[in-house]
A protein has these predicted regions:
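N-terminal alpha-helical interaction blocks
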Residues: 1-108
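N-terminal pre-domain and mature-chain start segments
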Residues: 90, 94, 105-109, 113, ...
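Short, flexible, mixed-charge glycine/proline-rich loop motifs
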Residues: 101-117, 125, 134-139
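Short cysteine-rich clusters marking metal-coordination/redox-active sites
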Residues: 118-121, 144-147
Length: 207
């Protein structure tokens, strides 16, 4: 069972799983099985499960939990980013909260997010390779150059930077580029990593 199935399980229109007993191990999981598996996955990968469930609007509580997990991670790694590490306690905490909140929102974006769908590939992540299409005489596709194959645009990091600048008025462009941006990007990447960990654990406990 993969995390995608968790989203389907919570959809009222999904007929995929029920509370009826399974005839064989290969049959669809029952509702009880799914809830038990989710509980096990949450105990081992709480960050990833919260991030995924929050992203898919399964729980508002999970959204806040995911941001809290991300803030903990940010505090843990902030020492690697000099411009952030040297901030005073209260200011540093507020900056990390801002970065974690915006980074999680970036992670949550998809082609279904209003205004985020790539205008070149219309959310498919694929585009026509004109040169090869002309060369081969048939349609040849390639990764969309605008969205890099994901089908949507990332949240503009400038919004996070503006919020940080309100907390650190004297933040310079070099400091932002060398410390704030790398930390922000690391937080977004961590969300995807934690989701992948949760996905693997959920798959393992439902085999």
């Amino acid at each position: 069972m993969r995390l995608e199935s968790v989203a389907k399980f919570h959809s009222p229109k999904s007929p995929m799983m029920s509370d009826s007993p399974r005839a064989t191990a290969s049959d669809s999981l029952s509702g009880t099985d799914v809830m038990a598996a989710m509980g096990m996955a949450q105990s081992q990968a709480g960050f990833g499960m919260a991030a995924f469930c929050g992203k898919h609007e399964l729980s508002q509580n999970d959204k806040q939990k995911a941001i809290n997990y991300l803030m903990q991670f940010a505090h843990k790694v902030s020492g690697k980013y000099r411009g952030v590490a040297k901030l005073e306690g209260n200011t540093k905490a507020k900056v990390l909260q801002v970065l974690a909140t915006f980074a999680y929102a970036d992670y949550c974006r998809s082609a279904a997010t209003p205004g985020a769908r790539c205008r070149d590939c219309h959310g498919t992540g694929r585009a026509v390779d004109i040169a090869k299409t002309e060369q081969w005489g048939r349609v040849v596709e390639k990764e969309c150059g605008r969205c890099k194959g994901v089908g949507y645009s990332r949240m503009p990091a400038s919004a996070a930077y503006r919020a940080v600048t309100m907390l650190i008025p004297n933040l310079t462009q070099p400091t932002r580029s060398r410390t704030v941006k790398p930390l922000y990007d690391a937080l977004v990447v961590q969300c995807h990593k934690e989701e992948s960990i949760a996905d693997n654990i959920l798959n393992a406990v439902t085999r």
